[in-house]
């Protein structure tokens, strides 16, 4: 069963504002580069970095959570994280973020490596913290995901990891 990742309003507003600012900055760089062709390489590098950043964060953003008989799968725009059910030690609701170590704390959601006092280092792929849940693996690795009907996903995974 596949469940869509929803975006909370805060993340949607941050994404729109960041996109407007980055597009404006790219436009300003292009405008300035036209007047200063001797600095065109510098502006091209700045534009490439800004464009790559927004594209990369979009491509790794979460789109859906899928649950089947053998695994929990977090689908990104490009790629997926597959967690075999036998690797899951614990799954429970979890609605708080942490200190961002590497990633995005608002652009397309909360995505990347985070840490906090409660669960330590963990990876977040969250669109809406009111629908978030923590997955702890036997290896100690931790993920925070979110999706619609997260309570049903938690219940289904729990019933399958106990068997």
Predicted regions and their residues:
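N-terminal membrane-targeting/pre-transmembrane regions
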Residues: 1-37, 134, 140-142
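Transmembrane alpha-helices and immediately adjacent membrane-cytoplasm interface residues
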Residues: 45-63
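Terminal membrane-proximal soluble interaction domains of membrane-associated proteins
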Residues: 131-160
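Short aromatic/basic micro-patch
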Residues: 66, 82, 144-147
């Amino acid at each position: 069963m596949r469940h869509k990742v929803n975006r909370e309003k805060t993340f949607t507003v941050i994404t729109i504002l960041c996109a407007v600012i980055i597009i404006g900055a790219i436009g300003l760089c292009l405008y300035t580069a036209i007047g200063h062709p001797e600095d065109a390489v510098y502006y091209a590098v700045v534009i490439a970095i800004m464009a790559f950043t927004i594209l990369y964060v979009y491509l790794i953003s979460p789109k859906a959570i899928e649950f089947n008989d053998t695994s929990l799968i977090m689908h990104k725009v490009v790629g997926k994280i597959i967690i075999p059910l036998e690797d899951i030690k614990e799954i429970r609701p979890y609605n708080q973020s942490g200190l961002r170590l590497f990633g995005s704390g608002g652009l397309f959601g909360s995505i990347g490596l985070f840490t906090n006092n409660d669960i330590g280092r963990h990876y977040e792929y969250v669109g809406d913290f009111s629908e978030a849940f923590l997955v702890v693996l036997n290896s100690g690795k931790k993920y925070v995901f979110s999706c619609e009907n997260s309570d049903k996903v938690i219940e289904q995974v729990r019933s399958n990891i106990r068997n």
